[in-house]
């Protein structure tokens, strides 16, 4: 293969800093950074290279860092939850944790001087944040009910873990994949409802039968960015589950060697596929693999609409249930300790996070125990039967903590949804997604109603506003929504949403 890495004279700021020093090099310097303090350390290390360790400097809360974890398949043990809760608790009101759409956790309020101690605690608990930021493969997504779903086709837990271990060198850091042209997302679906949002990942594996054998059809190139949003397209390949890791590795190597990072607005995998065409891209992947790929199965098994997972659901094992709780807009505070206790008292000590819904799942015992669980005070906040708008509400972090966000999102989203639920009767859930900027972390393009933050003018003054998206669909026949109205002031949004819910989604005034 011919390298298209740009000449050094054309390197942009990010490619230049990567060429000067691998981001993983800061792993050995964390103790020094902790002693120096954030104000005295090298700005490039602080603002950029620390992200290879999952540590993010935030200009909007200087001195308080964000820490992004790696939680493969979104599964945590009660012991791990306690370790994370202890980290958040030490910072009082400044500390909190957000569930992300990968599904992962981001811890906020972190002090740089505490990082070495925090990382030692993580290592003891089997946790890591390695390579969770910048131009790396992000958290690997799998089915939130893998291994316990009565209707699942493939248990994705082991595959997700193997892919992560390959990418991160078993959590130690892997220089082979620490210098991709841009960030990279991988998802492995094991159920019929596309719970992983396969279409918005750079590589997605969806279950499919070929010649009577269950494996995966492969999609490539899905992504969101400020410049362009594209759904993943078929690679025309079917793989045995045993070959998933090797195919991921081959695609990543092709992307690393031939993808162009010179223009960061045109450096995601789909841009390379567009430049080459799918036939050439597939051929390059086959060359890296060392053998031809099988052609795709005629159809995949994504046959259902997106399941909610909130509430009480029977597990694969007779007599056992799992309970899905709503964490409103994905924000966790002190209740993390309660979640750990509940997971142990009523289940096997395991908690799971979901992709779109941002929920917590607790595997439970027979129905007699479920009845006791439902009486827990925590379930007044994290409900098993929330309203039909709040249960599907998704929001990015917003301007409270993110310097890219153009508007405040989480608090505004919750306040507006409460008002709408108090005024309207709904027949079904409506998925409303908020994102603070065009980077689309809140994924408005997959929502029934998507709201993207922007700046608008009202009465001659600049104010916070949104662009309105509609038509997104998840599950079978997934589609990306489109922008239908631009520049709505947030103060004017409520009547617009109210009318949309009535006219398009069957809501009725109370």
Curated annotation (Swiss-Prot):
EC annotation from Swiss-Prot or TrEMBL: 1.7.7.1
Keywords: 4Fe-4S, Electron transport, Heme, Iron, Iron-sulfur, Metal-binding, Nitrate assimilation, Oxidoreductase, Transport
Enzymatic class: oxidoreductase
Homology family: Belongs to the nitrite and sulfite reductase 4Fe-4S domain family.
InterPro entries: NIR_SIR_4Fe-4S, NiRdtase/SiRdtase_haem-b_fer, Nit/Sulf_reduc_fer-like_dom_sf, NO2/SO3_Rdtase_4Fe4S_dom, NO2/SO3_Rdtase_4Fe4S_sf, NO2/SO3_Rdtase_FeS/sirohaem_BS
Reactions performed catalytically: 6 oxidized [2Fe-2S]-[ferredoxin] + NH4(+) + 2 H2O = nitrite + 6 reduced [2Fe-2S]-[ferredoxin] + 8 H(+)
Residues bound to siroheme: 441
Protein name: Ferredoxin--nitrite reductase
GO molecular function terms noted in the UniProt entry: 4 iron, 4 sulfur cluster binding; ferredoxin-nitrite reductase activity; heme binding; metal ion binding
SUPFAM superfamilies: Nitrite and sulphite reductase 4Fe-4S domain-like (SSF56014), Nitrite/Sulfite reductase N-terminal domain-like (SSF55124)
Residues binding [4Fe-4S] cluster: 396, 402, 437, 441
Biological processes annotated in GO: nitrate assimilation
Gene assigned in the entry: nirA
Pfam families linked to this entry: NIR_SIR, NIR_SIR_ferr
Top-rank taxon, per record: Bacteria
């Amino acid at each position: 293969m011919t390298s298209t890495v740009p000449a050094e004279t054309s390197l942009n700021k990010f490619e230049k800093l990567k060429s000067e020093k691998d981001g993983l090099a800061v792993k050995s310097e964390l103790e020094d950074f902790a002693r120096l303090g954030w104000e005295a350390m090298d700005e490039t290390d602080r603002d950029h290279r620390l992200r290879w360790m999952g540590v993010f400097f935030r200009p909007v809360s200087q001195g308080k860092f964000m820490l992004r974890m790696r939680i493969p398949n979104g599964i945590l043990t009660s012991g791990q939850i306690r370790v994370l809760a202890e980290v958040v608790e030490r910072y009082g009101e400044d500390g909190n944790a957000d569930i992300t759409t990968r599904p992962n956790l981001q811890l906020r309020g972190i002090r740089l001087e505490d990082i070495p101690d925090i990382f030692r605690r993580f290592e003891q608990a089997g946790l890591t944040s390695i390579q969770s930021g910048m131009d790396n493969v992000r958290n690997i997504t799998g089915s939130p009910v893998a291994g316990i779903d009565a209707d699942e086709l493939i248990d994705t837990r082991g595959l997700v873990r193997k892919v992560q271990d390959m990418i991160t060198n078993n959590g130690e850091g892997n220089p082979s994949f620490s210098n991709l042209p841009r960030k990279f997302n991988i998802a492995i679906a094991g159920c019929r409802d596309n719970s992983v949002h396969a279409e918005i990942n750079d590589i997605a594996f969806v279950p499919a039968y070929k010649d009577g054998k269950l494996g995966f059809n492969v999609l490539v190139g899905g992504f969101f960015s400020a410049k362009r949003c594209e759904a993943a397209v078929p690679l025309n390949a079917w793989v045995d589950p045993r070959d998933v890791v090797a195919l991921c590795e081959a695609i990543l190597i092709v992307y690393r060697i031939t993808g162009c990072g010179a223009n960061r607005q045109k450096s995601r995998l789909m841009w390379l596929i567009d430049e080459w065409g799918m036939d050439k891209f597939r051929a390059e992947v086959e060359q890296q693999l060392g053998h031809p790929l099988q052609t795709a199965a005629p159809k995949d098994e994504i046959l259902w609409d997106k399941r909610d997972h909130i509430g009480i659901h029977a597990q694969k094992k007779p007599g056992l249930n799992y309970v899905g709780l709503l964490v409103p807009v994905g924000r966790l505070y002190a209740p993390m300790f309660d979640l750990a206790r509940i997971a142990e008292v009523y289940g096997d000590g395991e908690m799971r996070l979901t992709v779109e819904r941002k929920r917590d799942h607790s595997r439970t015992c027979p129905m007699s125990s479920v009845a006791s669980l439902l009486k827990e005070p925590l379930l007044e906040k994290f409900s098993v039967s929330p309203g039909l708008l709040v249960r599907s509400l998704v929001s990015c972090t917003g301007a409270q903590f993110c310097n890219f966000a153009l508007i405040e999102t989480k608090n505004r989203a919750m306040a507006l949804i409460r008002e709408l639920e108090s005024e309207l009767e709904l027949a079904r859930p409506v998925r409303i997604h908020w994102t603070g900027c065009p980077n689309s972390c809140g994924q408005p393009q997959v929502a029934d109603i998507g709201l993207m933050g922007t700046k608008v003018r009202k009465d001659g003054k600049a104010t916070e506003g949104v662009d309105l998206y509609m038509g997104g669909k998840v599950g079978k026949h997934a589609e990306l929504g489109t922008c239908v109205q631009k520049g709505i002031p947030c103060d004017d949004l409520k009547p617009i949403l109210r009318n949309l819910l009535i006219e398009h989604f069957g809501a009725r005034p109370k």
